[in-house]
Amino acid sequence: MAVYAIADLHLPAGNKPMDIFGDHWIGHFERIRADWLDRVKPEDVVLLPGDLSWAMRLEEAGEDLRGIGALPGTKVLLRGNHDYWWSSIGRVRRALPEGMYALQNDALMLGGRLYAGSRGWTLPGPDAAEEDVKIYNRERMRLEMSLQHARRLSQDAPITAMMHFPPLTDEETGFSDILEKYGVSDCVYGHLHGPAIYGAVRGVRGAVRYHQVSCDGLDFRLYTLYGDQPIEKMTGEA
């Protein structure tokens, strides 16, 4: 069983194409879909850490969710900052096609590996707004709840964490202390685009290996976590 990851698909919800952000986004989901169909088998897992659709309401996200659901593999979803369609977790889960799972304050075991995570937030610096600090602290609690649930499922199974926002930077430790506390082996995240991708944290920091998986930084191909040769190509286009 291979495990892949890709974030920030930003599917159009019928009326918001991504090529307004640059020609490299033209036909981006068709490129992702072609790579997905070429590589992913029914028994594989694909992690989708946020910003799936521009839809504003759950009903409007249906076409985008069905488009992902029709692709092979088990899909594990996490909310991003632009997933405005993501309403109550119960409604979201009822709306998902078969083989798609949404994480929120909990965890999932697939193929002997645990999956947990939370959206995260902008890491607060010394001049951070009070509201940002409040949201950041709430996301820390949600991440811990998810990882606690993972450890209730298994004390020794490996954990892969999903986050949307970067969990740390070269200057800020961010969420890394919580990830290390629960023995997370790998953490995938998205959110960044364009030149910001170049400065993203990758590789082992502390006891966790970090993977930046925004789709435009992967040339609109899936990133391989386990079970295949990893993709090294980075575009860093705006």
Regions found by a protein language model. Give the residues of each.
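Core catalytic region of metal-dependent phosphoesterases/phosphodiesterases
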Residues: A2, N15-L110, F175-V184, V208, ...
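Short, hydrophobic/glycine-enriched beta-strand segments
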Residues: A2-D8
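Generic enzyme active-site microenvironment
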Residues: I6, P49-G50, L78, M162, ...
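Conserved catalytic scaffold of divalent metal-dependent phosphoesterases
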Residues: L9-K16, Y84-E171, D228-E237
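Active-site environment of divalent metal-dependent phosphoester hydrolases
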Residues: H10-N15, S53-E59, N81-I89, M109, ...
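Binuclear metal-dependent phosphoesterase catalytic core
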Residues: P17-M18, D23, G27, A34, ...
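His/acidic metal-ligating clusters that form di-metal
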Residues: R31-V45, G69, E130-G199
